[in-house]
Amino acid sequence: MHTSSLLCLRLTSVAFALILGHSVPAVARIYPAPVPLNEDFAGLTRVIDGDTIHVGDTRIRLEGIDAPESAQTCKRADGTEWACGTEATHAMRQMVEGREVVCRNHGLDLYGRTLATCFVGNLNINQQMVKLGLAWAYVKYSKAYVAEEAAARLTKTGIWQGEAMPAWDFRARTWTASAETAPEGCPIKGNVTANGRIYHMPWSPWYNKVRIDGHAGKRWFCTETEAQAAGWRPAFTYRAVTHSRAELQ
């Protein structure tokens, strides 16, 4: 099984946190590594978005790739927009939702999520997303999929058919814009729904529909770690698309 370079716990700066698509944390917590570093584990899969899945009870950030955020759009060659973020989530769901995958544990990221390379059968799903043009090779942290990205770019596949803002830039820009209008510059929305306490990042597809008015304990957070420590969980992006009423009420 081919794997990208091993990464352990990442503790760096605010800029690093924004690139990963999250706010600055206090500490890493929440998602412990299920097995020792560089060993395999398996389980049934639930899709969060184009580069994040749950395998059993473990939240996985797919190593070496960065997919468009679910609310993100890209442009075709003719300049028209398409929902590249939704398409990336859909492609991931088609590959793995409800299926057993085998993942190689590369350690934890800053937020305690397990970094992993995952396979369904013999298919490397990290690699496949880059081949489909539905994820960037995350070369700041791994060069495992540079060749696949070059091939997708050459054939103008997926995000390479027209203009597409890299996901890390999209997150940073969206965070900055939301923080300018959020109370005390803390733009994470902590909603209370029939499904429990759920927080939405500024790039969540339902972010603009959530109203934080103090009703039923709804509140703002400055960091994901703060939200998690208070008992909120991240919104499941795909489920939010298919079951939006429960996520938003």
Positions of PLM-derived features:
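Electropositive
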Residues: R29-Y138
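Bacterial N-terminal signal peptides that target proteins for export
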Residues: H2-T12
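Solvent-exposed, polar/charged alpha-helical surfaces in well-ordered, non-transmembrane soluble domains
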Residues: T86, H90, Q94, Q127, ...
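Bacterial N-terminal signal peptides
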Residues: T12-H22
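Bacterial Sec-dependent signal peptides at the C-terminal "C-region" and cleavage site
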Residues: L20-Y31
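Bulky hydrophobic/aromatic "packing anchor" residues in well-ordered structure
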Residues: L62, M129, A152, Y199-H200
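Mature, structured domains enriched in cysteine- and short glycine motifs
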Residues: V27-A28, A135-K143, L154-Q249
